[in-house]
Amino acid sequence: MGLMWGLFSVIIASAAQLSMGFAASHLPPMTHLWDFIAALLAFGLDARILLLGLLGYLLSVFCWYKTLHKLALSKAYALLSMSYVLVWIASMVLPGWEGTFSLKALLGVACIMSGLMLIFLPTTKQRY
């Protein structure tokens, strides 16, 4: 059950990260504070997507809390690295994100996935 909550947390956090990235690229920069505040107060699509991203992070924290009640921290924490993989793939697949493929990034993703598999391999008890 802890693994399920952990996966929910990762998926929701990845979606929240994508939402925040979209909003950040469409809202005025925070260096133009009054323009940024005006855009938030207008509550247009970009501001709503920003709010959804923030709410997604909040929901992800709830799922993470449930994860830590059921799964060892050493395993749970490793799950968070899957978010990097999901966001990288989504940035290449979703229109308008302009994510680029590179062999170096693919190698990094392969390392992350290999590490996760090693961490989650069932342990066998050794007899001495």
UniProtKB/Swiss-Prot annotation:
Positions in the Periplasmic compartment: 24-35, 98-100
GO molecular function: carbohydrate derivative transmembrane transporter activity
Residues exposed to the Cytoplasmic side: 1-2, 57-76, 122-128
Localisation per UniProt entry: Cell inner membrane
UniProt keyword list: Cell inner membrane, Cell membrane, Lipid A biosynthesis, Lipid biosynthesis, Lipid metabolism, Lipopolysaccharide biosynthesis, Membrane, Transmembrane, Transmembrane helix, Transport
Cysteines paired by S-S bonds: none
Transmembrane segments: 3-23, 36-56, 77-97, 101-121
Pathway annotation from the record: Bacterial outer membrane biogenesis; lipopolysaccharide biosynthesis
GO BP annotations, alphabetical order: lipid A biosynthetic process; lipopolysaccharide biosynthetic process
Main localization category: membrane
GO cellular component: plasma membrane
Membrane topology listed for this record: Multi-pass membrane protein
Keyword Phosphoprotein among record annotations: no
PANTHER family cross-referenced by the UniProt entry: 4-AMINO-4-DEOXY-L-ARABINOSE-PHOSPHOUNDECAPRENOL FLIPPASE SUBUNIT ARNF-RELATED, SMR FAMILY PROTON-DEPENDENT DRUG EFFLUX TRANSPORTER SUGE
Function summary: Translocates 4-amino-4-deoxy-L-arabinose-phosphoundecaprenol (alpha-L-Ara4N-phosphoundecaprenol) from the cytoplasmic to the periplasmic side of the inner membrane.
Family: Belongs to the ArnF family.
Quaternary assembly: Heterodimer of ArnE and ArnF.
Protein name: Probable 4-amino-4-deoxy-L-arabinose-phosphoundecaprenol flippase subunit ArnF
Taxonomic source organism: Escherichia coli O1:K1 / APEC
Taxonomic classification: Bacteria, Pseudomonadati, Pseudomonadota, Gammaproteobacteria, Enterobacterales
